[in-house]
UniProtKB/Swiss-Prot annotation:
GO cellular component, one term: plasma membrane-derived thylakoid membrane
Assembly notes: F-type ATPases have 2 components, F(1) - the catalytic core - and F(0) - the membrane proton channel. F(1) has five subunits: alpha(3), beta(3), gamma(1), delta(1), epsilon(1). F(0) has four main subunits: a(1), b(1), b'(1) and c(10-14). The alpha and beta chains form an alternating ring which encloses part of the gamma chain. F(1) is attached to F(0) by a central stalk formed by the gamma and epsilon chains, while a peripheral stalk is formed by the delta, b and b' chains.
UniProt entry tagged with the keyword Protein biosynthesis: no
Protein's recorded name: ATP synthase subunit b'
Subcellular locations according to the entry: Cellular thylakoid membrane
Magnesium among keywords: no
Family matches, as InterPro entries: ATP_synth_b (IPR034679), ATP_synth_B-like_membr_sf (IPR028987), ATP_synth_b/b'su_bac/chlpt (IPR002146), ATP_synthase_B_chain (IPR050059)
Organism per entry: Rippkaea orientalis (strain PCC 8801 / RF-1)
Gene giving rise to this polypeptide: atpF2
Transmembrane segments: 6-26
UniProt membrane topology term: Single-pass membrane protein
Family: Belongs to the ATPase B chain family.
Amino acid sequence: MFDFDATLPVMALQFILLAVILNGIFYTPLNKALDERADYIRQKETDEKERLAKAKELAQEYEKQLADARKQSQEVIAAAQADAQKIAAEALAKAQKEAQAKKEEAAVEIAQQRQAALGVLEQQVDVLSRQILEKLLGPELVK
């Protein structure tokens, strides 16, 4: 069926020689190119992971700074509101004090004017009463 002559070893030798030549000419440069490409991809992936980590870190720092700025602005606003309320309360107290003083002044003045008016009215009543009595009783009886 099969003849085992020199053809089989020659073909095996040719196959091995072809494999060695292809390995040297084709497979080694191809493997080298594939390895270089894989290294390049791994390097880029590592670089991108580092950039992503740095970007996340910067974003966290930015968020922290933003939160601090918001907190400070809220504190400033609260302090300004407290100052404004204090100033408004002082102004209101001053205005109320001035109004109370003017009210008391007006009350004293009204009381004085009332006393003066009552005094004048009393004198006029006395004069009118005397005149009425004189007319009714006559000037000789009224003294």
